[in-house]
Every structure is written in C-alpha cells, then in structure tokens.
C-alpha cells in the first residue's frame, strides 16, 4: 500500500510520531526516514505507550534511548541537503507489517505499539539493538497485549484513551501502603457511615458535606487506610479508591468533545473493573458545568447514567455553600448521592487529632513538639482565629510554630551573630590604627588586640556549644526518621503476613531506636548552657497567634505587667483632669489582659459624655498609642456621616443585589483586618437611630454579621462612643458632686437613646469641664509637641512660665475646653515662629526662648 493512502489509517499518536521522525531526519541531514527515526520519535512522545510497553517488558528506557541516539549518529549524512526526505524501503516494510497486524486484530486504525511488534518480526538492526538492551520478543509481545487490554482500535484517538485511570486519577489506597497518609483520628462515625452507604444496593454514593478545613478529605484517606489494612467489611476488601484529577482531565483539551472522550474513557475503565474501583471526586460541585459548551454535556450529566446503573461507586466531597449553590440545583444528580454531614470537631477532639499528628510533624521539622503546645494550638486557634475551622487552623498553627523553631536551628544564634558583627567592626578599626604611629594610637591598638582576642575566644566557645547542640538535634531527627520508616515497614509486614519480620521490628528494632532517642534527649537536657530552642512550647504557639491576628496572646513580660499596673499614669500624661474616665478604661484593659473579661463580649464598651474639647477623643488616641504603639490603629467613625436611615449599609456593607455588595462595610472590614483595635464612634448622637440597632449585637455578643453573611469578631476591641449630650448640664452643675452631675446628664441621654442600647454599654462616663489648673498642664503638653517638631529641624525650644500663664489666660474658655488654647498657641507662638524660620532668623543647633513682657510674647 502507498504511504499516503496508509497515513489516513494511522492513529493521531502514530501520525504525530511519523511527523516528528521526518523532522528528525531533516535535522540530521539523513536521506531517508529509517525505522530508527520512527522509534526515536515514539520514545520522545509525551505519555508514549512504547515507554509503558518497554518498562513492562523489563527494559531500561535510559539505556535504550542512548543506544538509539548513538545508532542515529552512525547513519550516513547527505553532503548538500535539499530538505527533502523519503520513507526508506525498510520503514515501508515495517509499516506494511503494522497494517497486516491491524487487520488481524480487527483494528480500524494502525496504532503505534504495532510498529514495535513489526520491528521484532522484520529482524533488522533495530531488533538487535533492542535485544542487546534487554528487550526480548516474548516479553514485549506480552506487554503489548497487556497495554491493549484485548480491545480493538476503533477510532483515531484510541491511544489517548488507554490507561485513562492512570493518567487522570491518583491511587489513594496506595498512599497508606507508602506511609504517605497521616493517621485519621476521631472520625470513626463518618467513616462507618460512608462504608455503610457504599454497601447499599442503589444510591451507594456518599457525599461528604462540611465547612472548609473540618477534614472531609481526611475521612476519605481514613477509609483508604482501612481498605489497605483490610479492616473493612468483606464487600469492600481488595477495592481500589481512586481520586479523580479534574485538572488533568481538562488540561490540554483543545477540541470540542475531547474532554467528554477522556471522562468517558475513565468511566468505561471503572465499569470494566466490575465494582472493584471506588472513585473519589474532591470538590464534586466542580463537575456541575465542567466541560460544558454549546450543545454538549457537562461532566455532571455524564456521571448520572453510570451512577443510576450502579456501575460507578463514587464518593464526593464539597462545602455546604457550594453544595447548595451547585448540587441542589441539579436535583437528578443530587438524589443519586447520599449526604454525610461532617461537623467541626470539638477542641478536645482536635487535641486528640494533634497528638496523633505530632510525631509526623516532629520527623518533618526535626524538632520536639510539647503536649502543652498541642493543647494551646487547639484552644487558642478556637478562641482567636475566626473564619476558619478546626482542626485545620490548629494544625496550621502547630506547623508554623515548628517551622519557626526549625528556621532558628538552621540559623546562627543571635548572641553569636552580635559577636560576629562586633569582631568585623573591631578588625576594621585595627586596620585603621595599624597605619598610625603616635603613642595614643599604639596604646589603643594594644587594647583593641586584647578585646579582639577576648571576643574571638568567646565566639569559639559559643560555636563549640552551638555545633554540639546542632549535632544532637540532627541525631535526634535522624533517629525519629528511622523510627517512622520502621513503623511503615511494620504495617507493610503485617499486611503481607510476614509475622517474623513484624515481630523483629516491633520487639527488637523499634524499642532499640526508642531507647537511643531517649538517651540522645537526656544528653541534650543535661547540657548546662543552651543557645537554641529545639522545642515548640505553648509560648511559641501564642507568638504565632499574635502574628496572625495582632491580638497580644503571648504570655505577658514583666515590663508589660508593670505598664498595665500603672496604666492610669500613662493615660493621665496626655489626658488631663479626667480621673474617672481614665480609671474605667484602665480597669477594662487590665481585666482583659489578665484573662478575666467575658470572652463573648468586647474588652470594654464606653459612652463618653461631656462638652467639646475636654479630652474624649484624646483618651481614645492615647489608648490606641498604649495598646499598639500607634494612634493609627484606632478605627474612627464620624457618626455625623450616618444621619440617613440607608447609611447603615455603609457600616456593614450593602446587601446582595445592591451596588457595592462586594466591597464590604467600613466598620466590618476595618475590624476584620485589625481584630484588636480601639473603635471610636465620634459624635454618636448625630447618627440615625437605626444605626444603633446594628450596634446592639456588637455590644452584647461581640460579633456582627456583614452584608456578605460573614461574622466579624469584635471580642478583642475597645468600643468607645463620644457624645456632647448634656454638656450644658455639665457646665451648670460644675460645682455640684460628680454623681449629681452624672444623673442629670444621664436623664438627657436616656431621653435620646433607647434603653436596650444604654443597658448594653459597660459604663457611661461623664467628663468634667476643664479648670484653669488643668489648662496649664495641657499647655505644657501642646508645647512639648511643638518642641518635638522643632527638634526635627535641629532647633531647641524653651518656654518661660510667664508665657505659659499668658497662653492659658488667652486660651481658657470653660465652654470650649482645650481647643481655644490650641488656637492661642497657633496664633501667638506658631505663626510668628513660622515667619522667623522662613526669614532664616534661627540657625540649626540654636535655642529659641519664648517669654512674655507684659504686653507681647518675646522670641530670643
């Protein structure tokens, strides 16, 4: 048969190989396309069936490929190539043989593995090369039959459909045999329920539904572990659990129908396995609509007939939201699955899960993880990390804390690093002094030499300790790794029924390694001086939680305890004349940091009442500065912007269907990003009454649901609302007792706000009006800020007492608080200073003295 006529009968794979063989012959300046060119092209093909056959037949692919390349180099080259190549008579003979075999097999197309069979029957140079590299005819023919699986080649893409399970699925039952699955604990009920559904006569397809991170995939891995251990009912023994790789199934599907062909090939192979394969589809909702294009089926619809007939045993896994959004819409697909709800485990169950994973993570990181660290990981993640589920978030905490310790072990200790940098500095200084000849320099050089020697000795001593510690840790990590391998081997020996080997490992090798590990740890503990941490403790877990959330969970240092005990002093340095307010806020912060505050409510919620300019907002700023070392960590919301009813949506986000739904709310987004913050609602009485309805949940439960249905945690915020209500009463009753003044103000407040709102606030605090004595201290604070601004320009400021007293006189107004004083400083001090600075009157490093001569302020 002519080659051109025959080429229409080749499969797509064989056509690609022949095209590649032609390119290879042209590239190497050969006159003809020889069998070597075709075989080389088949070897280089991605997912080549020739490679699979050669491996089954016991050949070494690397050696075969090298031998073929050497044989190609020995072929004669054309001196002046024209770029035209023809198929050689030998190649044509082989292709005719392929056609003959195809007809004998009842194939409609000629597939590439027939070329390999033709090579052996033609008995040419290529056959001798293959035999020389361990590929015997009998083994190759048997491998060809195994790959074909007794099927005829009936379409152009038949080769792509072969081994569909191997290409598009992952064997989950093989993973426990290789020791690659972490132990699954506390999910016996769900695994038993899944097995129960799998044994049903119809609708024997469980779908695991639960929030992200609760362990749906782990349940399937637990089932695979039981199948591998044969700890399952008789009907499930010997079955294979395969996970569908949807990405591989979709990748590279260039033409319409290609995806459907691949999925159909997978389903056909599963059907042929006669119930011995269980297919696991993670994120099963992605099958609804996958591969859908105009006029074609999607993957979900292709699964339905196989599920209905019972040909396909399938386990699905998806989240509650995605099940509702995708699966429930397709009722025909949904009814073929039986739901298994997977709930979030409790903190106690999570601790048990972590204890079982502990050893795996210790082996991976080469460190120790203490039991208190596991308990802390479960408890702290449950309390402080919202928006994620146990056990996933607790495992992540443990993993990151272990990674931090591992990184420290691999790095040079801080004390050695400091000495190293100091030595470099001293050596540079020594090089400079060596060039000097005067007596002072020589004395300094002598002192320097002594210091360098002392530092080098200290560094050498520390390095010796460090290297010994590193060696000890490395030794312990190696023993743990060996123990892990022995345990995997023990399980494999039990499965094989090799009880002699199992007994040797269990009662001989494992106890010996455990004893060795104990001795190593005892030696490490006995070292008097330790440079490195090699254990994850509860403190490391708390550090990671603080880093993730910004919430100070870590154990308080003595310095912080001291600061908290004297918090009033710190706040009073900036907030003058408001002792009651400062005490109330300080007590709330202390309760929280001592762990005594209600964990279901905000740290504190206060309503600050008082006239303008008395320090309500300043106290909030001071508190933010104390808690976070920055005033920027205060979420300030000006409530005068929320005077309309519809403006509530700006706080929590627009509801679905409205413009801005995807942008989130101003308040909820700010707190979601910084859960530990001071939230200030300024001028709260100016807001619409409906705004307070949204705040009721925040004040009582410490949480708020935003427009997108996400719960935002307010339990670690200090909520402060400021108001000018009753400020005229404060002025009128300034001479009366604090309680009398407060009750008069609260009457006005109760008339404006609803009782349920007032009742949820921890404390309503009335700020006093400011007296002249307070104004003097405020003037000092304001001038100190001016002094700091001038320091950046290298200028010093000194203000005489007469000048401060005059500023107080000019800026004192009982109705307006401290703000008139600020304006007086601007007008009488800052404005003249600005003119003088621009005129160049003051040079850097000079001192500006401000006085008062009885009429005007003086500047010297």
Curated annotation (Swiss-Prot):
Residues 6-150 form the Clp R domain. Residues 10-75 are annotated as: Repeat 1. One of its GO terms (molecular function) is ATP binding. One of its GO terms (cellular component) is cytoplasm. Keywords: ATP-binding, Chaperone, Coiled coil, Cytoplasm, Nucleotide-binding, Repeat, Stress response. One of its GO terms (biological process) is protein refolding. It is found in: Cytoplasm. It comes from the Bacteria. ATP 1 binds at residues 210-217. Residues 345-550 are annotated as: Linker. SUPFAM superfamilies: Double Clp-N motif (SSF81923), P-loop containing nucleoside triphosphate hydrolases (SSF52540). SMART domains: AAA (SM00382), ClpB_D2-small (SM01086). Residues 87-150 are annotated as: Repeat 2. It holds the Pfam family AAA. CDD domains: AAA, RecA-like_ClpB_Hsp104-like. ATP 2 binds at residues 610-617. Residues 163-344 are annotated as: NBD1. Residues 395-529 form a coiled coil. Residues 560-769 are annotated as: NBD2. Belongs to the ClpA/ClpB family. Part of a stress-induced multi-chaperone system, it is involved in the recovery of the cell from heat-induced damage, in cooperation with DnaK, DnaJ and GrpE. Acts before DnaK, in the processing of protein aggregates. Protein binding stimulates the ATPase activity; ATP hydrolysis unfolds the denatured protein aggregates, which probably helps expose new hydrophobic binding sites on the surface of ClpB-bound aggregates, contributing to the solubilization and refolding of denatured protein aggregates by DnaK. The Clp repeat (R) domain probably functions as a substrate-discriminating domain, recruiting aggregated proteins to the ClpB hexamer and/or stabilizing bound proteins. The NBD2 domain is responsible for oligomerization, whereas the NBD1 domain stabilizes the hexamer probably in an ATP-dependent manner. The movement of the coiled-coil domain is essential for ClpB ability to rescue proteins from an aggregated state, probably by pulling apart large aggregated proteins, which are bound between the coiled-coils motifs of adjacent ClpB subunits in the functional hexamer. This is Chaperone protein ClpB. The lineage of its organism: Bacteria, Pseudomonadati, Pseudomonadota, Gammaproteobacteria, Cardiobacteriales. The gene is clpB.
């Amino acid at each position: 048969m002519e080659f051109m006529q025959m080429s229409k009968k080749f499969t797509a794979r064989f056509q690609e190989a022949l095209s590649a063989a032609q390119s290879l012959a042209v590239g190497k300046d050969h006159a003809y396309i020889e069998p070597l060119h075709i075989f080389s092209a088949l070897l280089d093909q991605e997912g080549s069936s020739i490679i699979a056959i050669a491996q089954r037949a016991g050949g070494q692919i690397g050696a075969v490929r090298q031998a073929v390349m050497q044989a190609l180099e020995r072929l004669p080259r054309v001196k002046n190539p024209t770029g035209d190549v023809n198929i050689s008579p030998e190649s044509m003979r082989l292709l005719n043989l392929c056609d003959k075999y195809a007809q004998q097999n009842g194939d409609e197309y000629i597939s590439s593995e027939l070329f390999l069979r033709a090579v052996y029957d033609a008995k040419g140079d290529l056959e001798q090369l293959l035999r020389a590299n361990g590929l015997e005819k009998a083994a190759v023919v048997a491998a060809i039959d195994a790959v074909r699986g007794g099927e005829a080649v009936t379409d152009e893409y038949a080769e792509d459909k072969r081994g569909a399970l191997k290409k598009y699925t992952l064997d989950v039952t093989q993973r426990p045999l290789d020791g690659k699955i972490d132990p699954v604990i506390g999910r016996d009920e769900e695994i038993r329920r899944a097995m129960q559904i799998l044994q049903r006569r119809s609708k024997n397809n469980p779908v695991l539904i639960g929030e992200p991170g609760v362990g749906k995939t782990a349940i399937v891995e637990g089932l695979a572990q039981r199948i591998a251990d044969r700890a399952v009912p008789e009907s499930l023994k010997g079955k294979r659990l395969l996970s569908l790789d949807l990405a591989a199934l979709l990748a590279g599907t260039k033409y319409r129908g290609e995806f459907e062909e691949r999925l159909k090939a997978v389903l056909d192979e599963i059907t042929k396995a006669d119930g011995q394969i269980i297919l696991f589809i993670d994120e099963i909702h992605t099958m609804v609509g996958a591969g859908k294009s105009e006029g074609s089926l999607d993957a979900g619809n292709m699964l339905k007939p196989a599920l209905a007939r019972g040909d396909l045993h399938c386990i699905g896994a998806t989240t509650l939201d995605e099940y509702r959004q995708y699966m429930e819409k397709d009722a025909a697909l949904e009814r073929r699955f039986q739901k298994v709800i997977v709930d979030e485990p409790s903190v106690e169950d999570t601790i048990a899960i972590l204890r079982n994973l502990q050893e795996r993570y210790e082996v991976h990181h080469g460190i120790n993880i203490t039991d208190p660290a596991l308990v802390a990981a479960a408890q702290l993640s449950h309390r402080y990390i919202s928006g994620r589920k146990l056990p996933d978030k607790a495992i992540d905490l443990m993993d990151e804390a272990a990674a931090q310790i591992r990184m420290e072990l691999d790095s040079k200790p801080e004390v050695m690093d400091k000495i190293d940098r100091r030595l470099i500095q001293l050596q540079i200084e020594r090089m400079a002094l060596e060039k000097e000849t005067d007596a002072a320099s020589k004395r300094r050089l002598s002192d320097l030499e002594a210091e360098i020697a002392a530092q080098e000795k200290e560094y050498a001593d520390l390095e010796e300790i460090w290297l010994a510690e590193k060696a000890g840790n490395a030794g312990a990590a190696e023993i743990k790794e060996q123990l892990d391998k022995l345990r995997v081997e023990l399980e494999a020996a039990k499965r094989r029924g090799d009880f002699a080997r199992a007994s040797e490992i269990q009662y001989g090798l494992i106890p010996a390694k455990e004893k060795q590990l104990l001795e190593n740890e005892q030696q490490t503990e006995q070292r008097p001086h330790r440079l490195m941490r090699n254990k994850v403790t509860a403190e490391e877990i708390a550090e990671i939680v603080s880093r993730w959330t910004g919430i100070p969970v870590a154990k308080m240092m003595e310095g912080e305890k001291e600061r908290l005990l004297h918090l009033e002093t710190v706040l009073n340095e900036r907030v003058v004349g408001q002792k009651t307010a400062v005490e109330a806020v300080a007590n709330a912060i202390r309760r929280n940091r001592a762990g005594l505050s209600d964990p279901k409510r905000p740290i504190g919620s206060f309503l600050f009442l008082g006239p303008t300019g008395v320090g309500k907002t300043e106290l909030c700023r001071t508190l933010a500065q104390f808690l976070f070392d920055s005033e920027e960590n205060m979420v300030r919301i000006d409530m005068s912007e929320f005077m309309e009813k519809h403006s509530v949506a700006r706080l929590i986000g627009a509801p679905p269907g409205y413009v801005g739904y995807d942008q989130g709310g101003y308040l909820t987004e700010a707190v979601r990003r910084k859960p530990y913050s001071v939230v200030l609602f300024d001028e709260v009485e100016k807001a619409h009454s409906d705004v307070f309805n949204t705040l009721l949940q925040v004040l009582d439960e410490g949480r708020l649901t935003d427009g997108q249905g996400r719960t935002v945690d307010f339990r670690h915020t200090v909520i402060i609302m400021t108001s000018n209500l009753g400020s005229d009463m404060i002025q009128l009753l300034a001479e009366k007792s604090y309680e009398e003044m407060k009750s008069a103000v609260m009457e006005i407040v109760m008339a404006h706000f609803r009782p349920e709102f007032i009742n949820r606030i921890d404390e309503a605090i009335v700020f006093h009006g400011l007296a002249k004595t307070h104004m003097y201290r405020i003037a000092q604070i304001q001038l100190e800020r001016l002094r700091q601004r001038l320091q950046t320009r290298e200028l010093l400021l000194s203000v005489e007492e007469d000048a401060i007293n005059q500023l107080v006189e000019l800026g004192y107004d009982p109705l307006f608080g401290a703000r008139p004083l600020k304006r007086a400083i601007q007008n009488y001090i800052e404005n003249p200073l600005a003119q003088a600075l621009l005129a160049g009157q003051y040079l850097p490093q000079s001192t500006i003295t401000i006085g008062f001569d009885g009429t005007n302020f003086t500047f010297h």
